[in-house]
Curated annotation (Swiss-Prot):
Belongs to the SIX/Sine oculis homeobox family. Residues 1-10 have a biased composition (Polar residues). It comes from Homo sapiens (Human). Keywords: Acetylation, Cytoplasm, Developmental protein, DNA-binding, Homeobox, Nucleus, Phosphoprotein, Transcription, Transcription regulation. The keyword Isomerase does not apply. This is Homeobox protein SIX4. Residues 278-290, 299-308 have a biased composition (Basic and acidic residues). Its main location: nucleus. Transcriptional regulator which can act as both a transcriptional repressor and activator by binding a DNA sequence on these target genes and is involved in processes like cell differentiation, cell migration and cell survival. Transactivates gene expression by binding a 5'-[CAT]A[CT][CT][CTG]GA[GAT]-3' motif present in the Trex site and a 5'-TCA[AG][AG]TTNC-3' motif present in the MEF3 site of the muscle-specific genes enhancer. Acts cooperatively with EYA proteins to transactivate their target genes through interaction and nuclear translocation of EYA protein.
Length: 781
């Protein structure tokens, strides 16, 4: 009977199961419950399994331990699934074990269960974690276990059972270490529910509204509000350091980032944004506390003003309209851009902003200016009793250069760029004659203290071919920032009132009615088309010239007390353009015949301009004259052949004063050589009579009609000088600078009553010009 007894069959089945060594997951769970039942009848609980412990592994180990101790009932329960004939007995035995387990404590310790949950969470086995949690019995030991609750919340989120997730998170107060994970579960569950309801992904605003609508429960939140990823404690720490130091060092930033838990970039951006809000209080409401975006202003530029002159903008979007309604004599340079600026009666357009100035300021391409009666602005240079000269070295292209930036597209006169052409008008108070007069100038108070530069050690250059060599008698005054550049150009580009020179502009004859004070200005483009303005009324001593480029340029002839001169320029390469005042004899008529020659370029049509200043008590009439035909002007000039294009524009000047000058600015550059040709007027120019070296007085220029001799300037290459323009041996630089020096020079008696002054030399040889032998003595005319 033993062979047919159920006990023998169970034992044989257990032996077969142990020999095969195969158990399923369900059998493991059954064995787990059997172990729990066996513990109720006195079996010791199994030793804790090593970490991590899987549910099947734990059940298998428990079954083996119980089998070794002789627990035949546990082994029979594991093999009962394979025995069809013992189904009824095994089922009864299973119910008995389950009832025993409900009445007995948990077989595994809470720490063992928490370890298994953490292992499955870290491994990402959420399905196995769900089966393990389902297999755990109801026990008071597991109630309130935070690891178990966190695992249940994670499984509920994974399975999409969000109400159970919310119930778990709101029912238990979790530790702060678990807050970040549980907060993400809370928000992601809310986002997913909203996306399912709306049928579309959520944007940043939608997520923000959901966070406001469903705030975090206090069980997973410390109650400290976070503003733009910055907690209140972090923001307070940043504010405290900001009160002490607005510009913390990198070490302080790193320390603050460590304290607040923020990154170094967040700390730096917070300080930048805070400084920006303090500078612009009106934008505080529109700016975020710290959105991670860098500030628009660089920290290194804080508190430092830009002392360098600003070049003109090359934008051609529009032309600024200027309204001139003053009886003063200011010079306006039109700003290029979209801004519409209207100037008042006595203002200067300074880099696009209106600067109130006193009587008759002159603006010359810079941001430093001089105010005073009949003030002259020479970009930081004080020219009260001095004469400045523009010295640029050769080898310049035909483009206009302003502070090293090409201005071809600004001052170009091609017909395609002509978008709008306007002539500025100004009405005169009364019908008076148009006359011009410089007188003895007034010393102007400069905003920047200037230093006098003495010319020392300059060797004299002998004149060649019977020509005259130009030098100057008065020192140059410069500011403490050194020489400031003024736009200059080679290839016969012209200076108008010491301001901007440009070569492509063509101006047909200008006729002035001496009795009515009207001026008719007509301009022609490079392709022959002509823009003619209506006859306008000008004030006394004012002439307006307008360019054909989209950026109109306004010029005025200086009034009483103003000085025409150009400013020293350095940094360019080897060309020289100068503006010089020529004394005109008393009661002498000067017929200024302008010519331009030796121009090498492609399609450039230079204009040799001449401004003549006479006494205000006399008339200055420009007789109508003719220019070259547009077809002749528009011919392309070959690079290899210099072309002479004389302009038959004559001017008649009647003067009865000793302080009358004719400004000659028609310099032409001989490229490839160090010899600069300055063609004088072809008729009625005064011949300079040389005088003794130590003689000081007024020369008497002899006037004859056939004076057509061409004077040449011999250039002396010397070392470029530094900012303070001190002529010592330590101030030499690498680049070369062209200086003017001669044995004979033009008399400059317009600034003061004296005609000549002796220039001292210190017998120092600075440079040599090719094969020309340099002299050491300087003479006066």
């Amino acid at each position: 009977m033993s062979s047919s007894s159920p006990t023998g069959q169970i034992a044989s089945a257990a032996d077969i199961k142990q020999e095969n060594g195969m158990e399923s997951a369900s059998e493991g769970q059954e064995a787990h419950r059997e172990v729990a039942g066996g513990a109720a009848v006195g079996l010791s609980p199994p030793a804790p399994a090593p970490f991590p412990l899987e549910p099947g592994d734990a059940a298998t180990a428990a079954a083996r331990v119980s089998g070794e101790e002789g627990a035949v009932a546990a082994a029979a329960a594991g093999a009962a699934a394979d025995q069809v004939q013992l189904h009824s007995e095994l089922l009864g035995r299973h119910h008995h074990a389950a009832a025993a387990a409900a009445q007995t404590p948990l077989a595994f310790s809470p720490d063992h269960v928490a370890c298994v949950c953490e292992a499955l969470q870290q491994g990402g086995n959420l399905d196995r974690l769900a089966r393990f949690l389902w297999s755990l019995p109801q026990s008071d030991l597991l109630r309130g276990n935070e690891s178990l609750l966190k695992a249940r919340a994670l499984v509920a989120f994974h399975q999409g059972i969000y109400p159970e997730l919310y119930s778990i998170l709101e029912s238990h107060s979790f530790e702060s270490a678990n807050h970040p994970l549980l907060q993400q579960l809370w928000y992601k569950a809310r986002y997913t529910e909203a996306e399912r309801a709306r049928g579309r992904p959520l944007g940043a605003v939608d997520k923000y509204r959901l966070r406001r609508k469903f705030p975090l429960p206090r069980t997973i939140w410390d109650g400290e509000e976070t503003v733009y990823c910055f907690k209140e404690k972090s923001r307070n720490a940043l504010k405290e350091l900001y009160k002490q130091n607005r510009y913390p060092s990198p070490a302080e930033k790193r320390h603050l980032a460590k304290i607040t838990g923020l990154s170094l970039t967040q700390v730096s951006n917070w300080f930048k944004n805070r400084r920006q809000r303090d500078r612009n209080p009106s934008e505080t409401q529109s700016k975020s506390e710290s959105d991670g975006n860098p500030s628009t202003e660089d920290e290194s530029s804080k508190g430092h003003e830009d002392l360098s002159p600003h070049p003109l903008s090359s934008s051609s979007d529009g032309i600024t309209n200027l309204s001139l309604s003053s009886h003063m004599e200011p010079v306006y340079m039109q700003q290029i851009g979209n801004a519409k600026i209207s100037l008042s009666s006595s203002g200067v357009l300074l880099n696009g902003s209106l600067v109130p100035a006193s009587t008759s300021p002159v603006f010359l391409n810079g941001n430093s200016f001089i105010q005073g009666p009949s003030g002259v602005i020479l970009n930081g240079l004080n020219v009260g009793n001095t004469q400045a000269v523009a010295l640029n070295p050769p080898k310049m292209s035909s483009n206009i250069v302003s502070n090293g930036i090409s201005m071809t597209d600004i001052l170009g006169s091609t017909s395609q760029d002509v978008k709008e052409f306007k002539v500025l008008q100004s009405s005169a108070n009364s019908a008076t004659t148009t006359s011009y007069s410089p007188s003895v100038p007034v010393s102007f108070p400069g905003l920047i203290p200037s230093t006098e530069v003495k010319r020392e050690g300059i060797q004299t250059v002998a004149s060649q071919d019977g020509g005259s060599v130009v030098t100057f008698t008065t020192p140059v005054q410069i500011n403490q920032y050194g020489i400031v550049q003024i736009p200059n150009s080679g290839a016969n580009s012209q200076f108008l009132n010491g301001s901007i020179g440009f070569s492509p502009l063509q101006l047909p004859p200008v006729s002035v009615a001496a009795s009515q004070g009207n001026i008719s200005v007509s301009s022609s483009t490079s392709d022959g088309s002509t823009f003619t303005s209506e006859s306008t009324t000008v004030q006394q001593g004012k002439v307006f010239l307008s360019s054909l480029a989209p950026s109109a340029v306004v010029y005025t002839v200086p009034n009483t007390g103003q000085t025409i001169g150009s400013v020293k320029q350095e940094g360019l390469e080897r060309s020289l353009v100068f503006s010089q005042l020529m004394p005109v004899n008393q009661n002498a008529q000067v017929n200024a015949n302008l010519s331009s020659e030796n121009i090498s370029g492609s399609g450039l049509h230079p204009l040799a301009s001449s401004l003549v200043n006479v006494s205000p008590t006399h008339n200055f009439s420009l007789s109508p004259s003719t220019l070259l035909n547009p077809t002749e002007l528009n011919r392309d000039i070959a690079d290899s052949q210099p072309m002479s294009a004389p302009v038959a524009s004559k001017s008649t000047v009647t003067s009865v004063s000793n302080t009358n000058y004719a400004t000659l600015q028609n310099c032409s550059l001989i490229t490839g050589q160090d010899l600069l040709s300055v063609p004088m007027t072809q008729a009625a120019l005064g011949e300079i009579v040389p005088t003794a070296e130590d003689q000081v007085g007024h020369p008497s220029p002899a006037v004859h009609q056939d004076f057509v001799q061409e004077h040449r300037l011999v250039l002396q290459s010397v070392a470029n000088m530094k900012e303070n323009f001190l002529s010592n041996s330590e101030s030499k630089a690498t680049s070369s600078l062209m200086m003017l020096d001669s044995k004979s020079k033009y008399v400059l008696d317009g600034m003061v009553d004296t005609v000549c002054e002796d220039l001292e030399t210190d017998k120092k040889e600075l440079a040599k010009l090719q094969t020309v032998q340099l002299d050491e003595d300087m003479q006066d005319l």
